[in-house]
């Protein structure tokens, strides 16, 4: 057949369930975009097999069938267009929004391909995609005015000068009036005659329309509404995404792979009934059921700037097992279109397409996979959706239903199945990167991935089981995230040492966890991460900058004497991020004392290992890998909210090690089948989705700055994929008991991690006043250029000291040099 075959995975049906990862491979033919999982057909039940019994096989694969659907404008593109009409100098009657049909002309697309090949002195195209889009926005904002000039800022400007100025304000890159004029002439040579182009480059006749008010002049936007160059990139050009087709069906042996000829259809995309976009906040409990999306919206360094699609699938289950040799097929196809380049081939726009799949049961992650997607040659892209995992689940559900019916408890089995699908959710994240020839590494958004990859779309999945009289259908709708969500600032609750500040955004996000009281046990690092998202969360949670109540204590000068060791706070102490969770007792002590005569220095709460339930149909265990240089045989599971084992943490602190982790994890022993632990001597594989944690050793502490330390790399731990955090019990697995490590009572060397800043300084008073004046003058110049009103100025004056404090922490905390720490302390002391 002339269809694209997807990878086929052979699964057992005699035992009516699929087992864990095995040796039988899933072969993927060329030009296929499907699963790369490996499964075995080990029996799960002790069924009696006759001599004529043989394994009945189900072949699962991803199959894609395009189904046209109506395209809708995203809220992001709407906001970009809305910016063009803001801040007009005169009253203006805006007519209906006109499109840019000329952007999809083949002549224009060919011209753009040619433009990307030529570069100027800085190695970039003269008219890159960013500048090209700004150029067309400038044409919209500055209507044709013939040979007349426009007066602004006491000078006269022609239209080409206004366009050049507009481009500079929008992108931070200068293009001269001559370059703008030349570009207009080139485009006009092959776009002349197009109505949308004509209205942008030529004046309309005076009697063109008696119902429209004559245009007063170009749209001049104040700098506060102009996107700065640091925030403008191709990330602001949100791609339009629509679901072309989706289906999940079973094909009988020797039957075509089309869904219309299916033996059974679990669900398929409903056609001809497009759903209106829905605000994300109207999606019930989305933070609980889609943890990955919640983390993306709270990310500051790589903010979410893509469309979000919600697919609600109603699944019609089978009453019996399919015939031998049947195939489970899943087809998911999207259309991803660049708003500037229209229907240009995707091969010219992006490369290195990847898809991350996350499956959750009751909000707990049970599966995380990573797939490389073949490079598309059109705007259509086909995505894998874990067909092997679904085949396993469907087989188990059918078997459970048959067993319940045989025992007369079919109603209970039905309720279990319905509850399973109600709590089952999934998230798919599609990413791609620019071609190497178009990457502008020096102009990338701060904090973006080093490979230049960008999120193209986020797909959310909800599932339900159909009623007896229903058929399986899937509906697709777009979700609208509140604008400015990722830029919100959460400040600590007020106390004696803090000032209450209202959130900057008019649509605040309620935190997923209740706001901690300042009179509870300290949870200071959570305040830093949740209430101060404007700087990257530190890998080391420093407690020396907080008072005993757990709040910020920057209002008073730090003048503690160096010899007052009992008043210092240990910067290496680890705090419990989830004190409200039920704690489990262990054999290890919950605190470590410096000496019998001194106050207790290091308080480490006993943190339990999480036991995440995987539901009725959990996946098999996957092992973690330890690098060859690791002195400690432990790994960190990357599965959701979890604490750190207190006993293991104390052991690490005894060895004078500090854990540097980019996310909350679980310290547990690596398990392998056969009763042996991974000793860390071999690292046979480390996939594309491997995570790395580093250990650092504390050395050469200084006496300047807050918790200033010099950290040397000690080693690293590698972890591949997500696994259940509870090690399986039973024969074939080693015991989870850790050998007891003798407790060491001498912890005086840990006390050296604390640092008290000395108030002495070599800067004279005159120099200090000059620095303060220079900083204040620069800030005032930046703010006054925005021309804010009195209310905005009052708000800025309230927020600015706190922002300076956060900036000081970002500059000086764990800084590599003394200069950075001095800058931190200087700004902190003089920010008022």
From Swiss-Prot:
Compositional bias of kind Polar residues: 24-45, 665-678
Subcellular location: Nucleus
UniProt entry keywords in alphabetical sequence: Activator, Conidiation, Nucleus, Sporulation, Transcription, Transcription regulation
Pfam families hit by this protein: TEA (PF01285)
Residue span of region Disordered: 24-55, 561-596, 665-689, 718-740
Keyword field contains Transcription regulation: yes
Main location: nucleus
GO annotation, cellular component aspect: nucleus; transcription regulator complex
One GO term (biological process): conidium formation
GO molecular function: DNA-binding transcription factor activity, RNA polymerase II-specific; RNA polymerase II cis-regulatory region sequence-specific DNA binding
Family matches, as PROSITE patterns: TEA_2 (PS51088)
Biased composition (Low complexity): 582-591
Family as reported in the entry's similarity comment: Belongs to the TEC1 family.
Official protein name in the record: Conidiophore development regulator abaB
Organism this protein belongs to: Aspergillus oryzae (strain ATCC 42149 / RIB 40)
């Amino acid at each position: 057949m002339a269809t694209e075959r997807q990878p086929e995975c052979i699964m057992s049906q005699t035992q009516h369930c699929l087992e864990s990862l095995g040796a039988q491979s899933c072969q993927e033919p060329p030009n296929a975009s499907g699963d790369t999982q490996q499964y075995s057909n080990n029996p799960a039940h002790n069924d009696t097999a006759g001599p004529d019994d043989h394994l009945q096989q189900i072949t699962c694969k991803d199959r894609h069938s395009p189904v046209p659907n109506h395209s809708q404008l995203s809220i992001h593109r709407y906001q970009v267009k809305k910016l063009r009409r803001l801040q007009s100098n005169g009253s203006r009657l805006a007519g209906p929004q006109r499109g840019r049909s000329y952007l999809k002309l083949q002549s224009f697309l060919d011209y753009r391909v040619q433009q990307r090949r030529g570069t100027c002195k800085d190695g970039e195209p003269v008219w890159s995609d960013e500048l090209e889009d700004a150029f067309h926005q400038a044409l919209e904002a500055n209507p044709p005015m013939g040979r007349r000039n426009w007066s602004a800022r006491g000078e006269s400007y022609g239209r080409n000068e206004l366009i050049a100025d507009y481009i500079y304000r929008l992108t931070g890159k200068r293009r001269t009036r001559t370059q703008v004029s030349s570009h207009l002439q080139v485009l006009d040579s092959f776009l002349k005659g197009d109505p949308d182009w004509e209205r942008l480059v030529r004046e309309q006749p005076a009697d063109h329309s008696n119902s429209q008010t004559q245009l007063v002049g170009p749209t001049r936007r104040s700098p506060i509404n102009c996107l700065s160059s640091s925030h403008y990139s191709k990330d602001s050009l949100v791609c339009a995404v629509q679901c072309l087709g989706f289906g999940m069906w079973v094909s009988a042996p020797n039957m075509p792979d089309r869904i219309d000829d299916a033996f059974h259809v679990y669900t398929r995309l409903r056609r001809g009934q497009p759903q209106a976009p829905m605000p994300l906040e109207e999606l019930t409990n989305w933070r609980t059921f889609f943890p990955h999306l919640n983390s993306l919206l709270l990310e500051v360094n790589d903010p979410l700037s893509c469309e979000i699609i919600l697919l609600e699938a109603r699944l019609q289950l089978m009453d019996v097992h399919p015939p031998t040799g049947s195939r489970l097929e899943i087809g998911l196809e999207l259309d991803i279109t660049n708003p500037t380049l229209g229907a240009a081939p995707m091969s010219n726009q992006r490369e290195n397409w990847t898809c991350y799949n996350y499956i959750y049961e009751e909000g707990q992650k049970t599966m995380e996979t990573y797939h490389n997607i073949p490079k598309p040659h059109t705007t259509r892209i086909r995505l894998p959706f874990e067909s092997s995992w679904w085949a396993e689940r469907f087989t188990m559900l059918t078997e459970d239903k048959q067993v319940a019916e045989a025992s007369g408890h079919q109603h209970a089995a039905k309720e279990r199945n319905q509850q399973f699908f109600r709590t089952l959710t999934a998230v798919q994240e599609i990413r791609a990167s620019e071609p190497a020839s178009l990457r502008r590494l020096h102009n990338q958004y701060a904090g973006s991935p080093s490979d230049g990859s960008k999120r193209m779309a986020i797909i959310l999945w909800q599932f339900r089981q159909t009623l007896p009289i229903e058929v399986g259908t899937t509906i697709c709708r777009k979700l609208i995230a509140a604008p400015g969500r990722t830029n919100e600032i959460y400040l600590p609750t007020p106390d004696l040492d803090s000032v209450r500040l209202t959130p900057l955004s008019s649509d605040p996000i309620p935190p997923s966890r209740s706001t901690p009281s300042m009179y509870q046990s300290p949870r200071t690092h959570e305040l830093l991460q949740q209430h101060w998202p404007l700087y990257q969360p530190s890998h080391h949670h420093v407690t020396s900058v907080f008072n005993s109540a757990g709040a910020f204590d920057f209002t008073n000068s730090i003048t503690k004497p160096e010899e007052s060791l009992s008043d210092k706070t240990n910067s290496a102490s680890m705090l419990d991020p989830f004190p409200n969770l039920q704690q489990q007792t262990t054999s290890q002590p919950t605190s470590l004392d410096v000496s019998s005569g001194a106050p207790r220095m290091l308080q480490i709460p006993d943190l339990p290992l999480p036991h995440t339930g995987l539901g009725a149909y959990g996946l098999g265990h996957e092992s973690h890998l330890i690098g060859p240089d690791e002195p400690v045989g432990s790994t960190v599971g990357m599965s959701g909210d979890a604490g750190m084992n207190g006993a293991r943490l104390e052991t690490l602190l005894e060895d004078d090690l500090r854990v540097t982790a980019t996310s909350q994890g679980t310290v547990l022993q690596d398990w392998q089948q056969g009763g042996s632990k991974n000793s860390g001597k071999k690292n046979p594989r480390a996939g594309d989705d491997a995570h790395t944690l580093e250990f650092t050793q504390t050395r050469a502490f200084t006496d300047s700055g807050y918790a200033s330390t010099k950290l040397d790399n000690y080693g690293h731990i590698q972890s591949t994929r997500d696994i259940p955090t509870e090690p399986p019990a039973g024969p074939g697995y080693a015991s989870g008991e850790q050998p007891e490590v003798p407790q060491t009572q001498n912890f005086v060397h840990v006390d050296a991690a604390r640092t008290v800043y000395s108030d002495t300084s070599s800067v004279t008073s005159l120099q200090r006043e000059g620095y303060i004046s220079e900083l204040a003058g620069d800030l005032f110049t930046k703010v006054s250029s925005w021309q804010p009103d009195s209310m905005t100025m009052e708000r800025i004056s309230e927020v600015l000291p706190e922002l300076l404090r956060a900036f000081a922490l970002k500059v000086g905390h764990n800084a590599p040099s003394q200069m950075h720490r001095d800058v931190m302390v200087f700004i902190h002391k003089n920010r008022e």
